[in-house]
């Protein structure tokens, strides 16, 4: 089996030349070969050793004779990108007459920094720059993964520098690379032609441009071995790698590694999907759905029986790359999906959501890339206001192989679409986006795409509104910076949002809360009161003091509902009442610092207890795992799956946005109290958030 991997392609190349259909692998190999020829002609690239934090700077130099571009790359080491403050110190470009210019005297024509901006002649705090304890008066700092491109137009003959990590980096490591080409346009063309394949590949590399300019096949080999390290049994893949290593031609090596990458990625994806195939959970959901009006148990019982047999047979054959085993596993996943998406709560066959087009960064995205705040203490005012490619979409044909997507509304100004709320009538939705002057406001659009309008009108030039909700009587509750105060520990840089009540007919605006710190997520409870999350700072351990509150819609009788007097959890976001319950709700628990806004999915019931784990009914999808109280700042760092923005269908089934593991995409899932996790929509290059079933 392993030998066939190489022999097939070699036999084809040895025969008569035939016209081949271009695919992403062939196109990539061709582009890499052309770029490698250009690099070799210029004796490039020049690579440093793996340089770690606190090491002394290492000299690097390059011959620039006849070159039009100087490309300086800082690439992260195998330990990730934390504190990788790569620095080009005492860097200068030398002309043929011996005169020179310091690199810090020039501005790059193009640059990307892995964190913040490039910095000249200072460390990241504005102090004199040190590497290994030595002070440098001339330096350019560019965090990995980063690149700086200088158009030098054959003016210089030599480049010299000392490279290392700024002493602020107590951890971290960087590879430094000097090149004469940076294939930004070539990478863009490839990505446009093969967005799915190149988008997925980019999740495993430090940028398509750097990958295209690699001088050998080691990058492809590392990609495959990295994927293999995630497999329960990697023997097949590792043996195939050994076979490819014997090949002498670089292009052939690259091609075969990329073919092996495709198969290994397929195995990895199946392993992940199979880890969520829980027959006990599926049986429990099946038996529960039999009690629901509209569920055709007779139709789906044969599918369940087939799945039972597939699970009994097992799926270990996928690890040998056997095609029949791979197809059988894919059929089992499809059978699971068929059963669970037969849920009558999806009979409306429409789900509203916000879609963010993320391109090659989709696998690395977290909640702030989907329009949320970048931390757990700020309101929407601190979130990014522009640079998004986002729209509100309607998903249909949910049970089919090809889910249909219809764009309902897309901001024209690059704003995100946040805080998506369905109207009581099910024919329109409320959301937050920026106005032409970049202030946030609450807007509405009908589900047919018509009727777009601003909902809150106010003459004050510095007030903003966001995080709104409909009241049954037609009024609106939203958050606003109406108090003109900021979060204390960041010197007021993050504005605080308190709630206001707005009457559209009269444009009357009244402040409801007068809290020192933020309110979030007002939502109407089943008893007509409004619950929300309140963060309080004074005289409290503020890392752990985001409390679920409730009040009358007019702001009277503000009371704690859950979490007062407890340090677990730190934060409870995205709360939604459970249909048919007077007190129970679902929400996301998260930390203070660390991962922002997303976290663990919890069902609460304050009727059981008003704080701590005692008030938690269960964690989804871990019904049999006890919830252990943990007093920890970064509560959900390293926790997977990550969930955000749940919507209850009833008290057992929920729609939610989720990222199941660090390499995954943000998709929309149907989850339940039985531990089933079923994907409704997940697409390469995109991220989804705020799913809501369309029901009238």
Residue ranges and their predicted role:
Residues 17-188:
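Gly-Asp-aromatic-enriched flexible segments
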Residues 308, 315, 357-413, 437, ...:
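Beta-propeller domains
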Residues 346-347, 424-425, 471-473, 525-527, ...:
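Residue-level detector of Asp-centered blade-edge/turn motifs that repeat once per structural unit
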Residues 176-179, 390-396, 443-448, 493-506, ...:
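Beta-propeller blade signature
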Residues 356-387, 434, 439, 478-495, ...:
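Short, conserved, GDST-rich strand-edge loop motifs in beta-rich repeat architectures
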Residues 332, 401-415, 446-464, 502-517, ...:
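Multi-bladed beta-propeller domains
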Residues 438-501, 506-520:
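Asp-box/WD-like beta-propeller blade repeats and closely related beta-sheet repeat scaffolds
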């Amino acid at each position: 089996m392993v030998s066939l991997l190489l022999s097939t392609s070699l036999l084809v190349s040895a025969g008569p030349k035939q016209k081949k259909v271009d695919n992403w692998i062939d196109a990539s190999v061709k582009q890499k070969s052309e770029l490698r020829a250009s690099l070799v002609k210029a004796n490039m690239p020049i690579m440093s050793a793996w340089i770690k934090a606190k090491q002394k700077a290492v000299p690097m130099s390059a011959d620039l004779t006849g070159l039009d571009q100087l490309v300086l790359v800082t690439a992260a080491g195998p330990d990730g990108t934390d504190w990788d403050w790569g620095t080009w110190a005492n860097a200068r470009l030398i002309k043929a007459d011996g005169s020179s210019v310091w690199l810090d005297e020039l501005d790059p024509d193009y640059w990307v920094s892995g964190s913040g901006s490039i910095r000249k002649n200072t460390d990241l705090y504005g102090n004199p720059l040190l590497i290994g304890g030595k002070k440098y008066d001339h330096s350019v700092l560019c965090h990995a993964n980063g690149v700086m491109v200088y158009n030098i137009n054959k003016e210089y003959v030599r480049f010299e520098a000392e490279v290392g990590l700024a002493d602020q980096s107590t951890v971290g490591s960087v590879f430094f690379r000097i090149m004469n080409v940076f294939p930004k346009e070539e990478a863009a063309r490839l990505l446009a032609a093969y967005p799915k394949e190149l988008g997925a590949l980019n999740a495993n590399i430090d940028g398509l441009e750097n990958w295209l300019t690699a001088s050998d096949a080691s990058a492809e080999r590392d990609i495959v071995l990295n994927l293999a390290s995630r497999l329960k049994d990697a023997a097949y893949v590792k043996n195939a790698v050994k076979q490819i290593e014997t090949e002498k031609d670089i292009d052939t090596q690259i091609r075969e590694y990329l073919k092996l990458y495709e198969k290994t990625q397929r195995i990895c994806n199946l392993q992940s999907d199979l880890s969520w195939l829980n027959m006990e959970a599926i049986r429990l959901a099946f038996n529960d759905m039999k009690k629901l009006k509209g569920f055709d148990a007779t139709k789906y019982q044969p599918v369940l029986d087939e799945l039972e047999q597939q699970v009994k047979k097992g799926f270990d054959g996928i690890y040998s790359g056997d095609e029949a085993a791979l197809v059988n596993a894919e059929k089992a996943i499809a059978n699971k999906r068929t059963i669970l998406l037969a849920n009558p709560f999806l009979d409306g066959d429409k789900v509203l959501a916000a879609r963010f087009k993320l391109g090659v960064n989709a696998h690395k995205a977290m909640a702030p890339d989907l329009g949320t705040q970048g931390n757990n203490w700020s309101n929407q005012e601190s979130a990014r206001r522009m640079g998004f490619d986002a729209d509100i979409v309607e998903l249909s044909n949910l049970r089919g192989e090809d889910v249909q997507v219809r764009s309902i509304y897309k901001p024209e100004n690059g704003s995100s679409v946040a805080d998506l709320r369905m109207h009581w009538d099910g024919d329109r939705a409320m959301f937050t986006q920026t106005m032409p002057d970049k202030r946030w406001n609450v807007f509405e659009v009908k589900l047919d795409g018509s009727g777009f309008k601003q909902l809150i009108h106010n003459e004050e030039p510095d007030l903003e509104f966001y995080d709104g909700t409909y009241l049954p009587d037609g009024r609106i509750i939203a958050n606003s910076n109406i108090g003109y105060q900021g979060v204390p520990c960041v010197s007021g840089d993050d504005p605080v949002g308190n709630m206001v009540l707005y009457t559209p007919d009269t444009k009357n605006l009244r402040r409801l809360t007068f809290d020192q710190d933020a309110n979030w997520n007002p939502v109407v409870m089943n008893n007509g009161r409004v619950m929300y999350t309140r963060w309080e700072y004074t005289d409290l351990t503020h890392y752990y003091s985001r409390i679920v509150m409730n009040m009358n819609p007019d702001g009277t009788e503000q009371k704690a509902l859950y979490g007062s007097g407890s340090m677990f959890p730190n934060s409870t976001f995205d709360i939604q009442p459970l249909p048919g319950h007077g007190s129970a709700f679902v929400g996301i628990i998260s930390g203070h610092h660390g991962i922002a806004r997303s976290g663990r999915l919890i069902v609460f019931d304050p009727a059981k207890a008003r704080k701590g784990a005692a008030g938690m009914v269960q964690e989804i999808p871990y019904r049999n795992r006890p919830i252990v109280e943990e007093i920890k700042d970064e509560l959900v760092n390293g926790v997977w799956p990550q969930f955000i923005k749940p919507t209850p269908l009833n008290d057992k089934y929920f729609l939610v946005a989720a990222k199941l593991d660090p390499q995954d995409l943000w998709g929309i899932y149907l989850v339940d109290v039985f531990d089933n996790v079923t994907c409704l929509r997940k697409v390469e290059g995109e991220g989804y958030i705020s799913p809501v079933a369309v029901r009238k």
